[in-house]
């Protein structure tokens, strides 16, 4: 069984008690009462040419399957505000509990603390999770192409947009990129992590992203550990980089974020 499938199985198990405690009818009421979505597409678009530097989605991430514990992050809101001061264009919040140590409470705290679009980063395999994300104020949801068939991908994307949110559609291979584009992805993440081995190869980004439609927002995911990698992704045409580990492990994430954005300008 792949690591991805193990995580998805755990996500489905953890979802069941939430569905029992919060029936869909009540969830729909919470969606209707949620604050209006923030325009994530507008916030992320144009990073290839922005004179202020590449866009950054900064992540609240306590742990990962490949590295284990990364940072305690007792106050996600405090970290999110530092990201906002440092120039982040959006904040990603892990809500998967077993492997990443996240929660919907983290999402609530971050959404209330910043004025930036907020991504609920989880393993979306049901429509319920999309409604749940909106009920908790998410502006973006993650859709992993490898976890969904074509009908699910297109349907989840349509549902996400019908609720006023955008989707970060994540692909790892040329075939997944084709599927994401065919489904109508407007924000497409190219993740250079191998889902079977969890190894990261940042050099693959340029080849994978080459040929993406010009109007698609290009997000580089995984492998961002230094300013040199930011430069490489920017040179390869990324609009956005998603950075988690390098920021949560840094003693001064606000300063690190500013340095990352400035580094991208050297290749313009």
Curated annotation (Swiss-Prot):
Its EC number is 4.1.1.48. CDD domains: IGPS. The keyword Cytoplasm does not apply. GO terms for molecular function: indole-3-glycerol-phosphate synthase activity; phosphoribosylanthranilate isomerase activity. Pathway: Amino-acid biosynthesis; L-tryptophan biosynthesis; L-tryptophan from chorismate: step 4/5. GO terms for biological process: L-tryptophan biosynthetic process. Keywords: Amino-acid biosynthesis, Aromatic amino acid biosynthesis, Decarboxylase, Lyase, Tryptophan biosynthesis. It holds the Pfam family IGPS. It catalyses: 1-(2-carboxyphenylamino)-1-deoxy-D-ribulose 5-phosphate + H(+) = (1S,2R)-1-C-(indol-3-yl)glycerol 3-phosphate + CO2 + H2O. Belongs to the TrpC family. This is Indole-3-glycerol phosphate synthase.
